[in-house]
Swiss-Prot record:
Listed PROSITE patterns: GTP_CYCLOHYDROL_1_1, GTP_CYCLOHYDROL_1_2
Family indicated by similarity: Belongs to the GTP cyclohydrolase I family.
Gene3D superfamilies xref list: 1.10.286.10, 3.30.1130.10
A biological process term (GO) from this entry: tetrahydrobiopterin biosynthetic process
Activity regulation description: GTP shows a positive allosteric effect, and tetrahydrobiopterin inhibits the enzyme activity. Zinc is required for catalytic activity. Inhibited by Mg(2+).
GO molecular function: GTP binding; GTP cyclohydrolase I activity; GTPase activity; mitogen-activated protein kinase binding; protein homodimerization activity; zinc ion binding
Binding site for Zn(2+): 132, 135, 203
Site residues (Involved in pterin ring binding), renumbered to this chain: 87, 96
Main location as per UniProt: cytoplasm
Highest rank taxon of the organism: Eukaryota
Identification of the protein by name: GTP cyclohydrolase 1
Length: 241
């Protein structure tokens, strides 16, 4: 049987040939200019930043970039232990940033319910994994979300899905906190929203100051959570309990 073009067998595994480092990459698709004044927190309204088709097209280029990184580190990408590493790393990075393929409208579809509940709703200790956009290393932690409904509630699991969409991107913790709060506010129009994130940043643990036990805490308070100290204190007390 004739092998597909662009595929070779190495150590019994079939893999695509990587472009050589330094080779000119294929022409990039032009992207429409972003609207002036658009803020990161407004991204929940936008369409997908990346499609599955783009993943497939860009995977060889991403793998070639990892191969070039290995060479630049003085390694041999062709040795047995690293032979498939560029492809594994490229696939992993696409997964770590899969939030670019999802939109809030996909998640919230049919999950907003009319409900005459006017007491605080809290989901806390939501595990979160993200990638620091400054060093491309992980930061991990937990997210606590509370909101005061205004005639509508959101399926509880959808709060965790919102966290997943925004955390699976290149991020800074401050922006991530705000994006989650703004998305919930825009979707539900509640009386208020509070979001607190506690995270450990590998860029502080593995490099730089190398502080193993440091945690970064960020918060965004909107509506009555910002305006009313008693509401804010109730939320902060409940997430600590």
């Amino acid at each position: 049987m004739e092998k597909p073009r662009g595929v070779r067998c190495t150590n019994g595994f079939s893999e695509r040939e990587l472009p050589r480092p330094g080779a000119s990459p294929p022409a990039e698709k032009s992207r429409p200019p972003e609207a002036k004044g658009a803020q990161p927190a407004d991204a929940w309204k936008a369409g997908r930043h990346r499609s599955e088709e783009e993943n497939q097209v860009n995977l060889p280029k991403l793998a070639a970039a990892y191969s070039s990184i290995l060479l630049s580190l003085g390694e041999d990408p062709q040795r047995q232990g690293l032979l498939k590493t560029p492809w594994r790393a490229a696939t992993a990075m696409q997964y770590f940033t899969k939030g670019y393929q999802e939109t809030i409208s996909d998640v919230l579809n049919d999950a907003i319910f009319d409900e005459d509940h006017d007491e605080m709703v809290i989901v806390k200790d939501i595990d979160m994994f993200s990638m620091c956009e400054h060093h491309l290393v992980p930061f991990v932690g937990r997210v606590h979300i509370g909101y005061l409904p205004n005639k509508q509630v959101l399926g509880l699991s959808k709060l965790a899905r919102i966290v997943e969409i925004y955390s699976r991107r290149l991020q800074v913790q401050e922006r991530l906190t705000k994006q989650i709060a703004v998305a919930i506010t825009e979707a539900l129009q509640p009386a208020g929203v509070g979001v607190v994130i506690e995270a450990t940043h590998m860029c502080m643990v593995m490099r730089g100051v190398q502080k193993m036990n440091s945690k970064t805490v960020t918060s965004t308070m909107l509506g009555v959570f910002r305006e009313d100290p008693k509401t804010r204190e109730e939320f902060l007390t409940l997430i600590r309990s």
